[in-house]
């Protein structure tokens, strides 16, 4: 598997996580929607599924890991940033095969692609604190 296939899986997964957070639809429905309506060429579909279902099933645990390192209330974090840091935290915590530098860098890149102007700085700082306190 190529790194680019995982990168594409992360991009698709963060969009699906964002959609799931806002819609509160069943994860299986969100997954089906994304896999049938989005271009999945070059996407590691199995990894996309794992990220989406993993984040959804472990959201409470992931959020508890993040909250001590926030500079604001969790409710004040934008939905896009929540989706990104939840995905990256899932990889940092539950995917030991993903080097922490890769998980952080991918989170930063997702924030640059989907977040507000300085989202990448917030994501970088938060994930860096999380790694240092693990």
From Swiss-Prot:
Highest taxon of the lineage: Bacteria
Keywords attached to this entry: RNA-binding, Transcription, Transcription antitermination, Transcription regulation
GO cellular component: cytosol
A Gene Ontology molecular function term of the record: RNA binding
BP term (GO), one: transcription antitermination
Protein's UniProt keywords contain Transmembrane: no
NCBIfam families linked to this entry: nusB (TIGR01951)
Similarity field: Belongs to the NusB family.
Function statement: Involved in transcription antitermination. Required for transcription of ribosomal RNA (rRNA) genes. Binds specifically to the boxA antiterminator sequence of the ribosomal RNA (rrn) operons.
Protein name listed in UniProt: Transcription antitermination protein NusB
Taxonomic lineage from the root: Bacteria, Pseudomonadati, Pseudomonadota, Gammaproteobacteria, Alteromonadales
């Amino acid at each position: 598997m190529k790194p680019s296939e995982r990168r594409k899986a992360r991009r698709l997964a963060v969009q699906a996580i964002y959609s799931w957070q806002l819609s509160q639809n069943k994860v299986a429905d969100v997954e089906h929607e994304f896999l049938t309506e989005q271009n999945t060429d070059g996407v590691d579909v199995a990894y996309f599924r794992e990220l989406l279902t993993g984040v959804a099933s472990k959201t409470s645990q992931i959020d508890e890991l993040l909250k001590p390192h926030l500079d604001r209330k969790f409710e004040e974090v934008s939905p896009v940033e929540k989706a990104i840091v939840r995905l990256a935290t899932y990889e940092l915590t539950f995917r030991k095969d993903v080097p922490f530098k890769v998980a952080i860098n991918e989170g930063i890149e997702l924030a640059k692609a989907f977040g507000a102007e300085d989202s990448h700085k917030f994501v970088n700082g938060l994930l860096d604190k999380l790694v240092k306190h693990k």
